[in-house]
Amino acid sequence: MEPMSNKQDSNSSEGDEKGWPDVPKRKRKNSQCSMKSMSALSVSVPGYIPSYLEKDEPCVVCGDKATGYHYRCITCEGCKGFFRRTIQKNLHPAYSCKYEGCCIIDKITRNQCQLCRFKKCISVGMAMDLVLDDSKRVAKRRLIEENREKRKREEMVRTLQVRPEPDTAEWELIRMATDAHRHTNAQGSSWKQKRKFLSDDIGQGPMVPTSDGDKVDLEAFSEFTKIMTPAITRVVDFAKKLPMFSELPCEDQIILLKGCCMEIMSLRAAVRYDPESETLTLNGEMAVKREQLKNGGLGVVSDAIFDLGKSLAQFNLDDTEVALMQAVLLMSSDRSGLTSLEKIEQCQEAYLLAFEHYINYRKHNIPHFWPKLLMKVTDLRMIGACHASRFLHMKVECSSELFPPLFLEVFEDQEV
């Protein structure tokens, strides 16, 4: 087998194929050998084929420490490289020995006679036919790489096949979350047919400056506040229909709802992004453009929601996936002031597991679908935090009378 290592033996030399300095013309002490044992190059002795390398196992050519099974024999890196270069460059016809081809080859003398070293390689069983030329080496490495990639793909398929799907209890949790979403999601799947586009004139009127440097079109702001109360009410109704939420203390329920309300409303708007008209549909009824939403009070938060909508379009989420994402947002145990942290963590863990197993069941074609989708949860948390900051600035510049009571109740006193 052609080795992949290019490591050189510490006692080998790049001059293995070059001429060697003259030595005294007398037989060396180690030159006595049996001519029979060093017969013609065609002599082949079966190579030693161990199942594994034992500690300090010697090279069968020179006795140095072997590094592996090379060209059908256990050899060191030096003899492996010498044999490979000799065959690849067809150097052996030019090799000669000054001592009648009877040199003993060991760790010390191996570089002193190329012919005897090569004859020793052949005599112990190193196979010339296993040495590949450059084109075959490239082809072999390409084949190895292709096989490696093939194994990776097969392993990925096996991994996908063993990913757990929802069990009976999780299917029930999924069903109830999906029902909760469908019963509280305005217009359902017919939102495109029932939406009404906000007039282009709205969002282009006189602007009132805010303390954060942005400006607000009060006419657009008024339009948006009209749909805020029913939108917030639907989020509350969704939470009440969710398994486990009603079992939490009332104080914790209120904290969780205040924390997730903008996040869930943003998600519901983002999944109704229409690339053709470049609009988001709010509360299932009002289609708005980016600038209208921005000038109507959301400022930079508008950009974040529109960008999320564009990003989510490729995920092709169904009602169940949207419902489970909302449940995960709702059951966030890091909201300030919660008392039942452990129970809320357990609730979120249950929804996360059901969510992940449902994703496995759906078998999306997008690579790394699950971690990418979880990143969208992080994006929604950021949108919620940005909106809390934006609301503080709006409240400074705009009269409280402009805000619906439920809007104030939910978004006042939020952490920024």
UniProtKB/Swiss-Prot annotation:
Q: Does the keyword Nucleus apply?
A: yes
Any Gene Ontology biological process: negative regulation of transcription by RNA polymerase II
Q: DNA-binding region located at which positions?
A: 59-133
Q: Where in the cell is it found?
A: Nucleus
Give the source's domain of life in one word.
Answer: Eukaryota
Q: Which UniProt keywords apply?
A: DNA-binding, Metal-binding, Nucleus, Receptor, Transcription, Transcription regulation, Zinc, Zinc-finger
Sequence ranges of Basic and acidic residues compositional bias? 15-24
Chain residues that bind Zn(2+) 1: 59, 62, 76, 79
One annotated GO molecular function is: thyroid hormone binding
Q: Where is this region: Disordered?
A: 1-37
InterPro entries per the UniProt record, alphabetical: NHR-like_dom_sf, Nucl_hrmn_rcpt_lig-bd, Nuclear_hormone_rcpt_NR1, Nuclear_hrmn_rcpt, ThyrH_rcpt, Znf_hrmn_rcpt, Znf_NHR/GATA
**Gene Ontology terms: cellular component:** RNA polymerase II transcription regulator complex
Where are the NR C4-type-classified zinc fingers?
59-79, 97-121
Transcription regulation as UniProt keyword: yes
Region annotation Modulating: residue ranges?
1-58
NR LBD domain: from which residue to which, for each copy? 169-413
**Positions of 3,3',5-triiodo-L-thyronine binding:** 234
The UniProt function text for this chain reads: Nuclear hormone receptor that can act as a repressor or activator of transcription. High affinity receptor for thyroid hormones, including triiodothyronine and thyroxine.
Note on domains (UniProt)? Composed of three domains: a modulating N-terminal domain, a DNA-binding domain and a C-terminal ligand-binding domain.
PANTHER family from the UniProt entry: NUCLEAR HORMONE RECEPTOR, THYROID HORMONE RECEPTOR ALPHA
| Family per record | Belongs to the nuclear hormone receptor family. NR1 subfamily.
> What is the name of the protein in this document?
Thyroid hormone receptor alpha
